[in-house]
Regions:
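Non-catalytic DNA-binding core/recognition domains of DNA-processing enzymes
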Residues: 1-5
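Basic, amphipathic alpha-helical segments enriched in Lys/Arg and hydrophobic/aromatic residues
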Residues: 310-384
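An internal, acidic/charged active-site-proximal segment
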Residues: 153-261, 304
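Long, low-complexity, polar/charged, intrinsically disordered or flexibly structured peripheral segments
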Residues: 92, 99-103, 115, 251-306
């Protein structure tokens, strides 16, 4: 018996307000990283996905180089199949003739609650699932799936799911080296950047538009992509990254390298300067600015926003949308009318296994005729 009207609260996506929560969660996950997974339903389903999906796909080369693995993640809303209005437990209808009262009501789905769907801009009753996957080799292959209440947001769902994924890999002796991770602005929180920095995993995360204007870092003005601005207000040019110090060096945006007659030199494009002047005419690259990732991993991530590496991960992140669509619409998740979180979690993992199996079958039948494909399908089904 609950009063869900009181639970209808639109989540605040302001990174500053969420920073204490995400930092606390990040420190907790880091401190418990070596602990085993709890013996629960989720662990059983993770093991099934690993043995029937992830490992076979890796053996067939569908996950690419495991020592240079890029992952992407995203969440999606999952409405409950139960009645969001619940069942009345009071006598307001008989005594007052009121159908829509504010009294607590009884709900079939005890674990679901109200959450905000930012895409459709509506409240919904149910859960929110998060998944990490590999989007490459023309396939979108889930690596891990988790499920939380609808009221939970990506700020916390993402690091939780990533932590469970790493633990699952470790307990299955699945040795991978994650070299990059791509997310959307829902993970733009200082605690999440801190978590991935401590894990030594470069991330590609766009800045939340709510705070992407008039950015400042001390006396340094920044663009909407958190790139230092010169005196003329132009984004400075990233010169190089000092890996040992985890710092980026930016230089004058109108002084760029050029090659002429086989000789490399720096050329000053004075006509591009809004101030029509040179701040330091005698210098090859100056003025220069050096910013450190450790000082502010949100403003200065290892993967700069707008770089080729960033754009590659952003493009791969669209694979999560295709995978989410496959689970929810291709297999009509809503028509299943599942009324418990456990049933929804089971279905999500079985669909994830199907995604792997479809990719493997597609690779096995590439270039085959229709007759041979049918024969192979019958053989796999053990039908004579």
């Amino acid at each position: 018996i609950r009063n869900l009207k009181e639970e209808k609260i639109k989540p605040d996506d302001d990174p500053d307000k969420n920073e204490p929560v995400t930092m606390k969660l990040a420190k907790f996950l880091l401190s418990t990283a070596d602990e085993p997974r709890p013996q629960d339903l989720h662990k059983m389903l993770e093991d099934i996905l690993m043995e029937l999906g992830v490992k076979p796909s890796a053996e067939k080369g569908l996950l690419g180089e495991l020592q240079k693995l890029d992952v992407v993640g995203d969440s999606s809303c999952l409405p409950s199949g139960s009645n969001s209005s619940g069942k009345s437990t009071c006598n307001c209808l008989k005594e007052k003739g009121t159908r829509k009262c504010d009294c607590p009501r009884s709900y079939t789905d005890r674990t679901s609650n109200w959450g905000w769907d930012p895409y459709h801009e509506v409240f919904y009753f149910g859960d929110r699932f998060y998944q990490h996957l590999f989007a490459g080799n023309k396939h979108d292959l889930p690596l891990h799936v988790s499920l939380g209440p609808a009221s939970e947001v990506d700020y916390t769902l993402c690091p939780k799911d990533f932590d469970r994924m790493l633990k699952t890999f470790r307990e299955h002796n699945f040795h991978v080296n994650i070299t990059g991770a791509g997310y959307d602005k829902g993970v733009d929180a200082m605690g999440d950047y801190f978590y991935f920095m401590e894990k030594n995993i470069p991330v590609a995360i766009p800045l939340n538009k709510r705070r992407a204007k008039n950015l400042k870092d001390g006396n340094l003005n920044l663009s909407s992509n958190a790139i230092p601005l010169c005196k003329a207000g132009k984004e400075m040019r990233r010169h190089y990254f000092k890996k040992e110090q985890m710092s980026h060096v930016y230089c004058c945006p109108i002084k760029r390298g050029s090659r002429k007659n086989g000789e490399f030199r720096y050329v000053t494009h004075r006509e591009e300067c809004p101030l029509d002047t040179l701040c330091e005419p005698d210098a090859t690259l100056a003025p220069t600015v050096q910013v450190c990732t450790k000082d502010n991993p949100r403003f200065y991530p290892v993967i700069p926003r707008g770089s080729k590496r960033y754009k590659k991960l952003a493009k791969e992140r669209t694979g999560t949308e295709r995978s989410n669509s496959f689970k929810k619409w291709a297999y009509s998740f809503d028509k299943a009318q599942l009324k418990s979180r456990a049933h929804r979690l089971i279905r999500l993992h079985l669909l994830a296994v199907i995604e792997h199996r479809k990719a493997m079958f597609k690779e096995e039948t590439r270039g085959l005729s229709k007759d041979k494909i049918v024969q192979l399908a019958l053989k796999n089904m053990e039908i004579n």
